[in-house]
UniProtKB/Swiss-Prot annotation:
Biological process according to GO: actomyosin contractile ring assembly; cellular bud neck septin ring organization; cytoskeleton-dependent cytokinesis; division septum assembly; endoplasmic reticulum polarization; exit from mitosis; G1/S transition of mitotic cell cycle; hyphal growth
Stretches with biased composition (Low complexity): 395-404, 433-446, 463-473, 489-500
Gene3D superfamilies: P-loop containing nucleotide triphosphate hydrolases (3.40.50.300)
Subunit structure, interactors included: Component of the septin complex which consists of CDC3, CDC10, CDC11, CDC12 and probably SEP7. The purified septin complex appeared to have a stoichiometry of 2 CDC3, 1 to 2 CDC10, 1 CDC11, 2 CDC12, and 1 or none SEP7 subunit. Induction of hyphal growth brings about important modifications in septin ring dynamics, because the rings were found in a different state from those of yeast cells. This hyphal-specific state contains a core of stable septins (SEP7, CDC3, and CDC12), and it shows a high CDC10 turnover between the ring and the cytoplasm. Interacts with GIN4.
Function: Septins are GTPases involved in cytokinesis that assemble early in the cell cycle as a patch at the incipient bud site and form a ring before bud emergence, which transforms into an hour-glass shaped collar of cortical filaments that spans both sides of the mother-bud neck. This collar persists until just before cytokinesis, when it splits into two rings that occupy opposite sides of the neck. The septins at the bud neck serve as a structural scaffold that recruits different components involved in diverse processes at specific stages during the cell cycle.
Residue span of region G4 motif: 216-219
Name listed for the protein in its UniProt record: Septation protein 7
GO cellular component annotations of the record: cell division site; cell septum; cellular bud neck; cytosol; Gin4 complex; microtubule cytoskeleton; septin complex; septin ring
PROSITE patterns: G_SEPTIN (PS51719), SIGMA54_INTERACT_1 (PS00675)
Chain intervals for the UniProt region annotation (G1 motif): 43-50
Keywords annotated in UniProt: Cell cycle, Cell division, Coiled coil, GTP-binding, Hydrolase, Nucleotide-binding, Phosphoprotein
Subcellular localization(s) per the UniProt record: Bud neck
Amino acid sequence: MSRFDYRNTSKNTSVVDPDHSSPIINYRKDAKKGIKFTFMVVGESGTGKTTFINSLLNKKVLNHRYEKLSPTVGDTKTLMFTSAKSVALPNTSILTKNEFNPRTINEEPGIALTETHIEIIDDDNQKLLLNIIDTPGFGENLNNELCFIEIENYLKQQFDLVLAEETRIKRNPRFVDTRVHVMLYFITPTGHGLREIDIQCMKRLSKYVNIIPVIGKADSFTLNELQHFKQQIRIDIQKFNVPTFQFDNSLNDYDEDEDYDLIQECKFLTNLQPFAVVTSEDVFEVRESTTSTKGNNDKPKIIRARKYPWGLVDINDTRYSDFPILKSVLLGSHLQDLKDLTHDFLYETYRTERLTKVTGNGQAFDDEENEDAEFHDTVEHQLNDSNRGVGGDDNNNNNNNNNNASTIPSMSNLAQLTTSTNEHDASHIDNNSITSTSSSIKKSTSMLIDDHPSSSPKLKNISSFTSSTSTVSLEGGEKEGGHHDRGANSTSTNNNNNNNAFKRLSIGPQRNQLRQISETVPYVLRHERILERQQKLEEMEQASARELANRAALLEKKAAQLKAKEKALRQLELNRQKQEESATSSLHRKDSDISGSVQSGGVDDGKSESTNNNNNNRNGYGYGHGHGHGQSHEYDNSEYHHDDSTPNYETSRLQKDETLTDLHSIVSNH
């Protein structure tokens, strides 16, 4: 059967060579599952994060801010959101700002974490599963401490999930590792070095993730300005001790002769940091002139570039942009290095600190000296208890027991102590607990070792026990000062019993400790996460209550102002009505006074006119003339009386004068 033919391997497993089959199986599994890689982009709005991601993957993955929703290839979801005012939102759909709203632009956006899954298949048919974490709202608040806290909590939570899964007795085979392997920090292109927010963010998050600084929109600088900006950033990183990813950390592990190219590449990348990238989502077709034997031919080429009035800037041109180099680092040459450093250094450091805090001990559990000391203390206490429990009539045995009790067990006298106490070890082995003198805590025997000793063919002549630091073998044959009258069978049985006893003494505490950790750590981590969430919810509730109280007070204040305004308007209306009534009454009084004066004036004029007429008649005017003129006078008098009924006093006086003039004219004619 061929070694690559895996049929019927379950029936005849010895035929398959494991050295040749394992790599193929692992490669097939890895090719099917794919390589998982997670990176995070952090930076203020407008530094080019979204355009960088879309350019990195050569497709539309994320939508820009204030851009109309367009179809994307990635599946984006919101992991968490925290408002600047710690007010709970009804849903996360209001986070998407597709249109600019000037009324709400002054509000603090808070911080949100979004996750996008992308699957890439390269030319070798290798699958790459990318997980992209974006941080919209970073750096846009008055107090950006909120952003640092939320990102740090998310990174720690991913470490806690892995730690809880590792310490479980029964692990989940479908567990997904969501740790972030690298963080791309986009520096605002000011040209003056790092700002305070940049230094604080990178120093605070460097404990949980690899950080690579990136300068976005590098085409906004000239070559000299860009080199000066990079130098200022390097000076600030060194001055403020900002830990970033170093490409030359592992140069000592390489051979200068065999790995010369790799060493030079790492040095080049170290001197190139921070990466200055030019990105674009626009695609152009250009003609690339090539010289051949037949003549000059223009070959079309598709590029991603930025268009300016004077020409195009190719984002993959290393003369102006470090984008192709950074892309090769992330998705190629240093992908596995970033993952290994995350797991082997960052996670292990966090794991050690976390377990130390969870268990309450001030020392790590992998300290060999502490384990060895605990083992010897346990052996000494167990032997002292067994010696104190021995009773008999033999004085020599009592003396030996007393001497053994006062003797500290070591590797030299361990065989003698074992032989002297072999008669009573079985009774003490069956106890359910072993007391340690160093901790004074009653520990149960290991559940991984059977309490009933069973003979083994390998332990007939030699009894051995194994600890975490040493292995001791005790010969069960000839012993100096031993008693040969007990026989070979009893010696072999006692040695087997002693062997199991020392196994429990050495392995039992470690197994119990590991079991305690595996049972405790996941629940402690989960309990802490629940407490953190509960505290966060309480803070949000308190903030919401304060916000509602402020809004209620503001509404009450506005209502009081409206009531006062309404009352003032009513008072003004009443005053206006009173003024109108007073003005109307005064006009009526004036009209009545005028009408009364006019009536009194008309009566006086009538009396004077009748007096004048009587005087004229008395003066001897002719009857005919008097009669004729009397008719006209009666007409005028009737007209006068008609006019006298009107209230206009001036008009009546004018008519009276005209009547007198007519009388004078009549007299003059005669």
